[in-house]
Amino acid sequence: IKDIKTMIYAFYELSSRMENVRLHILGGVDDEEYADECYALVKQLDIKNLVFTGRVDIVQYMRKLDFTILTSISEGQPLSVLESFAARRPCVTTDVGCCRELLNGKEGDDFGCAGYCVPPMYRDGLAAAMEKMCESRRRRIRMGKSGQARTKAYYRHERMISEYRKLYREVEEAYGRDWI
C-alpha cells in the first residue's frame, strides 16, 4: 500500500528548508480517486517543484535522480528499492517489509548502509531523512555503491535460482520428494 500523501507533505516541509530540490513521483495511476487527492494536495500546498511523471522507462529515468523514496505502509520485498540499488541510487524508505534489511543488510553483510529507514506515515522523519540525503553528494554516492554491491551479491537472477534450488533440496531431504 503506497502512501504518496506522506511523501508530498514531507517534501513540502523539505522544500521550505532547502532550495533547489525537486520531487519526481514516478509511475502510473492505479487508483484514480487517490491520485486526484494527491494532485489536489499539491495544488493546496502550492508546491511548484513536484512532478507526477506517469509511466516512464525506469532504467532511463533513474539516471536523472539523486536518490529514491518509498513511502509504503505495507510492503513485502519492494522491487523499486532493488531497481534503485541496481542503478546505484540510495533510498529513503519506510520501515515495512524487508526495507530495513535491504538498506542495512543482514548479519555478516559488510556492504554498508544504502539509505535511511523511517517509520511509516511519519512525515517529519521522512523530511529529515530526505534532507540528510540531499545534504551530501558524497554520502549518496557511497550509499548508492553499497546498495548496488548488496544487490549484486544477494539478488542477481543466478543467485536467486541457486537459493531456491537449495531450499527445494532441503525440503526434499526433510520431507521427501512427494511433499514438493
Each language-model region and where it sits:
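Glycosyltransferase donor-sugar binding loop
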Residues: 22-36, 52
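Nucleotide-activated donor-binding/catalytic signature segment of Leloir-type glycosyltransferases, i.e.
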Residues: 36-55
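A short, well-ordered alpha-helix in the C-terminal region of glycosyltransferases
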Residues: 132, 139-153, 163-166
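Aromatic "clamp/platform" in nucleotide-sugar-dependent glycosyltransferases that forms part
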Residues: 73
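Conserved active-site histidine-acidic residue motif and adjacent donor-binding/catalytic loop
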Residues: 50-62, 121
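Conserved acidic donor-binding segment of nucleotide-sugar-dependent glycosyltransferases
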Residues: 105-123, 132-137
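A conserved mid-protein helix/loop that constitutes part of the nucleotide-sugar donor-binding site
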Residues: 1-13, 33-36, 124
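Short hydrophobic beta-strand element within catalytic cores of glycosyltransferases
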Residues: 90-93, 97-104
